[in-house]
Amino acid sequence: MALPSLLLVVAALAGGVRPPGARNLTLAVVLPEHNLSYAWAWPRVGPAVALAVEALGRALPVDLRFVSSELDGACSEYLAPLRAVDLKLYHDPDLLLGPGCVYPAASVARFASHWHLPLLTAGAVASGFAAKNEHYRTLVRTGPSAPKLGEFVVTLHGHFNWTARAALLYLDARTDDRPHYFTIEGVFEALQGSNLSVQHQVYTREPGGPEQATHFIRANGRIVYICGPLEMLHEILLQAQRENLTNGDYVFFYLDVFGESLRAGPTRATGRPWQDNRTQEQAQALREAFQTVLVITYREPPNPEYQEFQNRLLIRAREDFGVELAPSLMNLIAGCFYDGILLYAQVLNETIQEGGTREDGLRIVEKMQGRRYHGVTGLVVMDKNNDRETDFVLWAMGDLESGDFQPAAHYSGAEKQIWWTGRPIPWVKGAPPLDNPPCAFDLDDPSCDKTPLSTLAIVALGTGITFIMFGVSSFLIFRKLMLEKELASMLWRIRWEELQFGNSDRYHKGAGSRLTLSLRGSSYGSLMTAHGKYQIFANTGHFKGNVVAIKHVNKKRIELTRQVLFELKHMRDVQFNHLTRFIGACIDPPNICIVTEYCPRGSLQDILENDSINLDWMFRYSLINDLVKGMAFLHNSIISSHGSLKSSNCVVDSRFVLKITDYGLASFRSTAEPDDSHALYAKKLWTAPELLSGNPLPTTGMQKADVYSFAIILQEIALRSGPFYLEGLDLSPKEIVQKVRNGQRPYFRPSIDRTQLNEELVLLMERCWAQDPTERPDFGQIKGFIRRFNKEGGTSILDNLLLRMEQYANNLEKLVEERTQAYLEEKRKAEALLYQILPHSVAEQLKRGETVQAEAFDSVTIYFSDIVGFTALSAESTPMQVVTLLNDLYTCFDAIIDNFDVYKVETIGDAYMVVSGLPGRNGQRHAPEIARMALALLDAVSSFRIRHRPHDQLRLRIGVHTGPVCAGVVGLKMPRYCLFGDTVNTASRMESNGQALKIHVSSTTKDALDELGCFQLELRGDVEMKGKGKMRTYWLLGERKGPPGLL
């Protein structure tokens, strides 16, 4: 059920009044009112609370109202708990919001825990809150916290292999809320918990402070963390520059979580924290020193919802609170409060649905643990302690010319992983410094003895170095000669005569791997090739007795330059299980082609588009794993990148191992399609936006483009709806490519059904097709990512292969069963159609393969009827109206004759022919059966209405005759069961010489009916019949309800 109608009252410390009798959801705020230097100040957070309340009002039937009063003492550890008690006594709130300052948060959190009252804050960053013991059981931190910063730092140390020591410097005035102390505390505890030697010192602003800092750094660590105002960092770096500590042996991490140093200020530009109002010499020294500085900040959410939220936040702050806020990372805290309120409402709703109440604070808080949901600040992940996982950014001087700081890495707290942007960190010595170099700190080590070497030792050392240099030179010369020999031998070359074509059944039945370009299942139909076909096939041949795949190159000749020779050598050298093996190339004009390993299962695109193949997620993850392994190897090889990765370039061998093909040999590649062809745009559906736009690429540009292509393939595998599936949109490949190329927010990407897919898989897709190539992970990171959430992927290679083969066998068995059922269904339909065309006995003879002989019948009764005035009626009606009329009439007739022992022979226009007494003989019952049927049809016609002429009466004329006939099947194409003999002609004359709405019968039929004595007949007289002369005929008037006769 939904929440009941609620009144949300924001009671700010004192003065709020709960309306009598109202069922209120009361939210109490304990935040500072005026000090905007706090990110959690009420003028910053208040607009976010108002926006959250409005969002709740749209989602739930809520009656909302604010009650506010003066806010003071919210960052005082003495006044804040008193205000909290007042709030509890006077307003009995359901949720406390704040405080953000650490010391008052500790006091208020203890009270809240005692009251079992949820306390939600996006501040209170201290590590002491991480252990939610009995003092802080109801504290929920939906914003960043110092322990999460520590986790990021530990991950950084692991990446750079810093395992020994670190030094921490921070400012701690002890007269404020100690923000620098509590921020660096998380780093200290995390590093200490990782068994590092961590020393820390408080920076003093008194004279000699910078010298004391550099002395502390020299003595305690090469990896230095500094937390304090930017002026403090400048002072330390200037002194470090003077003492040559910025020579690359040290690295300085500046903990500026809100990124204030990167924002533009009175004396500095955006992204230039080294700029300051100093002398030119000091400014140059600072700029050089900052090359050794890495800045750590929170990560601004990249999702469009956050940008929209921030814009609305600034407007509401100006209109409702009279303050001008600037776009900055401080607004992230307001967004965290917003997401926290919505999280509380969601969990409260669930609690009430489960039979709980708003007063059950502990239960509500416990349900928040481990939550994952998407808020305005992106993906919100709460850990088991109800602390939010936090994302960070590592900034470095990415442009040495301008000195601009740029993101070097992003850290995902939810994934515990660093995603490197591809921008290299400008290490002064080209590599990260060592955290514990030999003899830097442990001077007691005997190996650190710096006694000068003797003359004999120097001579021996020089001789040894000379021999080593001579050996290395000889080896390099030998290797150079062997390389030239290998290039000249052209081991890759295949003569056209060596390739065998023709009847492939002799070697390999079914050769011809289907490398489809069909886009069946997508929203824009099938891709047609230049030849008008819906798929293209991989050409195959035979080389040295083995089936090989042959890719023809649309070039007249290949110039064997040194570059081309090296490309071909590299293709032979690259060997890996998940890359198709390069066998060789033919350069004999006009038969220029590339010869590679043949994979008989076809392409990945074939498999995904084949609905008869059931792919469970174990199988899909196995294919994804193969693809990632292949691309990781390719990116680390001499070839470096693929450049044209798509599902049709991923093939599957006989053991269901996915292999990547069509890589390398850039000199052989060519585009045969015209620039505006449909096929060309369809191939570009996997192409990264930076390649489509044609902008210059960074060093790793093609590798990051491959990652984008991998994301599109990942979406294909996940949804099996074709590349770039767009739910509800019908766009051509050209339109899709143009939208991707434009690069406008929100970026145009395929549709994803988050409810059906693993959330981590969706996140991986989104990271891989990020607009900024630097934000995409590399395949090494992707491999680790997939290994984590593919729990079943740890089986052995043999087990994996057996599972794949078993699934393939199951698919085949299911396919055979489906095809059998389809065959039986089609057989049933064919037999039903045959029984409608021919009599059942005749159809059975044909099914048994027997010849149907013509058969004579001594006595049958034939019925003929047509519509009087049908020609005139047809002339006055449209063809569709005539068809509708006949269909309605004969549907009515067919339903009636099913009640009698008769057989419908045929209908020709408005003529209707029925017989009784054949093909199944029924003795003397044929005449009364036809008579009763004729009376029933005549009765039906009297009430029949013509749709387009409802006031007209349909006039049916009926003729009946009894006599001998011969019946048989005539013709091979569309065979018909026909009647022959004078009886047929006479019956037709009886109908044509009859009258409308009357049944005209012959004397023979009258004699047959008289034997029963229950039919009323009236003599018509002698009637002149064409070709028959005069015949005595009768009108059948009806059937008497007397005692039954023989029938």
UniProtKB/Swiss-Prot annotation:
<keyword id="KW-1133">Transmembrane helix</keyword>
<dbReference type="GO" id="GO:0007033">
    <property type="term" value="P:vacuole organization"/>
</dbReference>
<feature type="glycosylation site" description="N-linked (GlcNAc...) asparagine">
    <location>
        <position position="35"/>
    </location>
</feature>
<dbReference type="GO" id="GO:0021562">
    <property type="term" value="P:vestibulocochlear nerve development"/>
</dbReference>
<dbReference type="GO" id="GO:0005886">
    <property type="term" value="C:plasma membrane"/>
</dbReference>
<dbReference type="InterPro" id="IPR001828">
    <property type="entry name" value="ANF_lig-bd_rcpt"/>
</dbReference>
<dbReference type="InterPro" id="IPR029787">
    <property type="entry name" value="Nucleotide_cyclase"/>
</dbReference>
<dbReference type="GO" id="GO:0021675">
    <property type="term" value="P:nerve development"/>
</dbReference>
<dbReference type="GO" id="GO:0051321">
    <property type="term" value="P:meiotic cell cycle"/>
</dbReference>
<dbReference type="InterPro" id="IPR018297">
    <property type="entry name" value="A/G_cyclase_CS"/>
</dbReference>
<dbReference type="GO" id="GO:0051447">
    <property type="term" value="P:negative regulation of meiotic cell cycle"/>
</dbReference>
<dbReference type="GO" id="GO:0007173">
    <property type="term" value="P:epidermal growth factor receptor signaling pathway"/>
</dbReference>
<dbReference type="GO" id="GO:0051276">
    <property type="term" value="P:chromosome organization"/>
</dbReference>
<dbReference type="GO" id="GO:0007283">
    <property type="term" value="P:spermatogenesis"/>
</dbReference>
<dbReference type="GO" id="GO:0060466">
    <property type="term" value="P:activation of meiosis involved in egg activation"/>
</dbReference>
<dbReference type="GO" id="GO:0001974">
    <property type="term" value="P:blood vessel remodeling"/>
</dbReference>
<comment type="similarity">
    <text>Belongs to the adenylyl cyclase class-4/guanylyl cyclase family.</text>
</comment>
<dbReference type="InterPro" id="IPR001245">
    <property type="entry name" value="Ser-Thr/Tyr_kinase_cat_dom"/>
</dbReference>
<feature type="topological domain" description="Extracellular">
    <location>
        <begin position="17"/>
        <end position="458"/>
    </location>
</feature>
<dbReference type="InterPro" id="IPR001054">
    <property type="entry name" value="A/G_cyclase"/>
</dbReference>
<dbReference type="GO" id="GO:0060348">
    <property type="term" value="P:bone development"/>
</dbReference>
<dbReference type="GO" id="GO:0000165">
    <property type="term" value="P:MAPK cascade"/>
</dbReference>
<dbReference type="GO" id="GO:0097194">
    <property type="term" value="P:execution phase of apoptosis"/>
</dbReference>
<dbReference type="GO" id="GO:0009725">
    <property type="term" value="P:response to hormone"/>
</dbReference>
<feature type="glycosylation site" description="N-linked (GlcNAc...) asparagine">
    <location>
        <position position="161"/>
    </location>
</feature>
<dbReference type="GO" id="GO:0034699">
    <property type="term" value="P:response to luteinizing hormone"/>
</dbReference>
<dbReference type="GO" id="GO:0030540">
    <property type="term" value="P:female genitalia development"/>
</dbReference>
<keyword id="KW-0547">Nucleotide-binding</keyword>
<dbReference type="GO" id="GO:0007409">
    <property type="term" value="P:axonogenesis"/>
</dbReference>
<dbReference type="GO" id="GO:0051216">
    <property type="term" value="P:cartilage development"/>
</dbReference>
<dbReference type="GO" id="GO:0019228">
    <property type="term" value="P:neuronal action potential"/>
</dbReference>
<feature type="modified residue" description="Phosphoserine">
    <location>
        <position position="513"/>
    </location>
</feature>
<dbReference type="GO" id="GO:0017046">
    <property type="term" value="F:peptide hormone binding"/>
</dbReference>
<feature type="glycosylation site" description="N-linked (GlcNAc...) asparagine">
    <location>
        <position position="195"/>
    </location>
</feature>
<dbReference type="GO" id="GO:0004672">
    <property type="term" value="F:protein kinase activity"/>
</dbReference>
<feature type="modified residue" description="Phosphoserine">
    <location>
        <position position="523"/>
    </location>
</feature>
<feature type="glycosylation site" description="N-linked (GlcNAc...) asparagine">
    <location>
        <position position="24"/>
    </location>
</feature>
<dbReference type="GO" id="GO:0009611">
    <property type="term" value="P:response to wounding"/>
</dbReference>
<feature type="modified residue" description="Phosphoserine">
    <location>
        <position position="526"/>
    </location>
</feature>
<dbReference type="GO" id="GO:0035988">
    <property type="term" value="P:chondrocyte proliferation"/>
</dbReference>
<dbReference type="GO" id="GO:0007338">
    <property type="term" value="P:single fertilization"/>
</dbReference>
<dbReference type="GO" id="GO:1902074">
    <property type="term" value="P:response to salt"/>
</dbReference>
